[in-house]
Amino acid sequence: MAKSHLLPWLLLLPILCGPGTAAAITYSLACAQGPEFWCQSLEQALQCRALGHCLQEVWGHVEADDLCQECENISRLLTKMAKEAIFQDSVRKFLEQECDVLPLKLLAPLCRHLLDTYFPLIIEHFQSHMNPKFICQHVGLCKPRHPEPGKGPEPWGPLLDKLALPLLPGVPQAKPGPQTQDLSEQLFPIPIPYCWLCRTLIKRIQAVIPKGVLAMTVAQVCHVVPLLVGGICQCLVERYSVILLDTLLGRMLPQLVCGLVLRCSSEDSAGPALPALGSVPGEWLPQDSDCQLCMFVTTQAGNSSEQATPQAMRQACLGTWLDRQKCERFVEENAPRLQTLVSSGWDAHMACQALGTCAAPFSPLQCVHSPHF
């Protein structure tokens, strides 16, 4: 009888202890390889208790190759997200709602048609064709590499073949531009600003992608190390994750999507070209208005109890200088995360940095400070 009660626990024991034990043994053996293995990633440095060595001897400065590697890592993460059915459904529903609230009602059916036609193709392309190395070369974070002998051209071709634009009259085919003037006038009473519409939808997609959550997920590993080292770890995460996510989402999506689907010029779809590697100008950082909105809402709710914080944030949106609709949308999307950060002792600026709406200057000497560092 005793055996029958003991058996389930014996079966559970490998599940509860096995992975951690096996991982510890694996890392113990791997750490014996020395610094070359320790400093390949933050996780390996922590597991081998060599974070201090890696910070001082290997990670002391941010080089162009570091940015390239981090860009590729984040691109793989975003591409993986694009493959998730739940994420696709959320983005699709969100964009359909955005189509319905466009200021010019005439554009709503066209916007829906744009989604119906091209959303599945773009998702399929990200799933099967998009290469992180190519993405990061395209946005200027990796140096261009010459194609290896025997390999085909860079992966614009497959999507361009599919997006022959058979269903969208009036799309510019030869000379790209912000509007479809002098095209398809017999079908639409006004020129249809396809590139503007594309840019508008792409910017709204960025609100669905949880930049702050992704950066905070990376930062979770910092909590398993001593406080001082944990603060340095948080500094590294701030330097890489949030800045690169802002860069990739703000520059990559308009260039890749609007440039491919509608042949919008880079000036129309993504603003000026990216600067050379090694410099990260202030324009890469989040817009001041978004940062100010986050700071204001968080500050106004800072003195409230944990239960009253969401209501206090919504009340803050009644401020006369705020865009109320934008503020309420921001609170709806971010209140739970902000509440968690504020209740943990983070001030408004730190919380908004972690959320991704505010960012510190990109400098090895200036990092976000957690309550413990």
From Swiss-Prot:
Indicate which residues are glycosylated according to the record.
N73, N303
What is the designated name of this protein?
Pulmonary surfactant-associated protein B
Gene it is expressed from: SFTPB
Keywords from UniProt, A to Z, are:
Disulfide bond, Gaseous exchange, Glycoprotein, Repeat, Secreted, Signal, Surface film
Q: How does it assemble?
A: Homodimer; disulfide-linked.
Q: Where is the Saposin B-type domain?
A: 64-146, 191-268, 287-362
Q: Where is the Saposin A-type domain?
A: 24-64
Note the SS bond partners.
C68-C142, C71-C136, C99-C111, C195-C264, C198-C258, C222-C233, C291-C358, C294-C352, C317-C327
Superkingdom in the source lineage: Eukaryota
- Annotated signal sequence range: 1-22
Chief location of this protein within or outside the cell: secreted
What job does the chain carry out?
A: Pulmonary surfactant-associated proteins promote alveolar stability by lowering the surface tension at the air-liquid interface in the peripheral air spaces. SP-B increases the collapse pressure of palmitic acid to nearly 70 millinewtons per meter.
Misc remark for this entry? Answer: Pulmonary surfactant consists of 90% lipid and 10% protein. There are 4 surfactant-associated proteins: 2 collagenous, carbohydrate-binding glycoproteins (SP-A and SP-D) and 2 small hydrophobic proteins (SP-B and SP-C).
What the entry lists under InterPro entries is as follows:
SAP_A, SapB_2, Saposin, Saposin-like, SaposinB_dom, Sphingo_Act-Surfact_Prot
Biological processes annotated in GO: respiratory gaseous exchange by respiratory system; sphingolipid metabolic process
Q: Which residues form a coiled coil?
A: none
* Pfam families assigned to the protein according to its UniProt record, in alphabetical order: SapA (PF02199), SapB_2 (PF03489)
* Prodomain residues: 23-187, 267-373
Q: Which GO terms describe its cellular component?
A: alveolar lamellar body; extracellular space; lysosome; membrane; multivesicular body
Where is the protein situated, by its record's location annotation? Secreted, Extracellular space, Surface film
